[in-house]
């Protein structure tokens, strides 16, 4: 049983709201981004995302469901041929709303709603993370026999650094002394 939406209606009546959302969605799919008032953009977002989800499925039944809401066959074709396959690997979040400056005439809060055209990096990041984990796992297995040799090597490096540290300190002191001598020779005004 159809139930009316909660809250105030855009345009006054529910039929006008349905027509308004259908026209806004048509413009969004046709142009990729539209500028409208903020309440209209917020109402359009779930409406458009449900239509994109239908387009991702791509079946005839889904096309007919979308045609019930969007009457422009060219836009529906674009939705199913281009927009749906583009978002095939994305789980929701197909649109973004960006607030812009208020409208000049009546100071109404305005927003730009647009289709997100950037690919997500999460799939690439997950793949890179899996590759890195598998490489780390393959390196950990043969490194266990070498673990006993590493502490001895680290002690030798530490001893070498301890001998080199006093020599470095003496060189630093010599450089500081020459800088002081240069400062004494400089003419003072």
UniProtKB/Swiss-Prot annotation:
Is Protein biosynthesis tagged as a keyword? no
Alphabetical GO CC annotations of the entry are: cytosolic large ribosomal subunit
The UniProt regions of compositional bias labelled Low complexity, in chain numbering, are 139-180
One BP term from GO: translation
Q: Which PROSITE patterns match?
A: RIBOSOMAL_L17
The record's annotation in PANTHER family points to:
LARGE RIBOSOMAL SUBUNIT PROTEIN BL17M, RIBOSOMAL PROTEIN L17
GO molecular function annotations of the record: structural constituent of ribosome
Q: Which lineage do the record's taxonomy fields give for this organism?
A: Bacteria, Bacillati, Actinomycetota, Actinomycetes, Mycobacteriales
The UniProt entry's sequence similarity note says: Belongs to the bacterial ribosomal protein bL17 family.
Which keywords describe this protein according to UniProt? Answer: Ribonucleoprotein, Ribosomal protein
Q: Do the record's keywords include Cell cycle? A: no
Map out region (Disordered) in residue numbers. Answer: 126-189
According to the UniProt entry, where is the signal peptide?
none
| InterPro entries per UniProt | Ribosomal_bL17, Ribosomal_bL17_CS, Ribosomal_bL17_sf
Oligomeric and partner information:
Part of the 50S ribosomal subunit. Contacts protein L32.
UniProt-recorded name of the protein: Large ribosomal subunit protein bL17
Q: Quote the gene name from the UniProt entry.
A: rplQ
Q: Which Pfam families match?
A: Ribosomal_L17
């Amino acid at each position: 049983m159809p139930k009316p939406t909660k809250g105030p209606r855009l345009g006054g009546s529910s039929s006008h709201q349905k027509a308004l959302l259908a026209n806004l969605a048509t413009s969004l799919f046709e142009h990729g981004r539209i500028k409208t008032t903020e309440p209209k953009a917020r109402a359009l977002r779930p409406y458009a995302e449900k239509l994109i989800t239908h387009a991702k499925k791509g079946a005839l039944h889904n096309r007919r469901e979308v045609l019930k809401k969007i009457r422009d066959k060219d836009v529906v074709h674009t939705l199913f041929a281009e927009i749906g396959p583009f978002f095939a690997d994305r789980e929701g979040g197909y649109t973004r709303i960006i607030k812009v400056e208020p409208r000049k005439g009546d100071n109404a809060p305005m927003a730009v709603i647009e289709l997100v055209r950037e690919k997500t990096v999460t799939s690439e990041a997950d793949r890179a993370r899996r590759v890195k984990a598998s490489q780390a796992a393959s390196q950990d297995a043969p490194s266990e026999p070498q673990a006993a040799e590493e502490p001895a090597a680290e002690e030798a490096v530490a001893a070498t650094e301890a001998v080199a540290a006093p020599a470095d300190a003496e060189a630093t002191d010599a450089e500081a002394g020459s800088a002081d001598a240069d400062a004494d020779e400089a003419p003072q005004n």
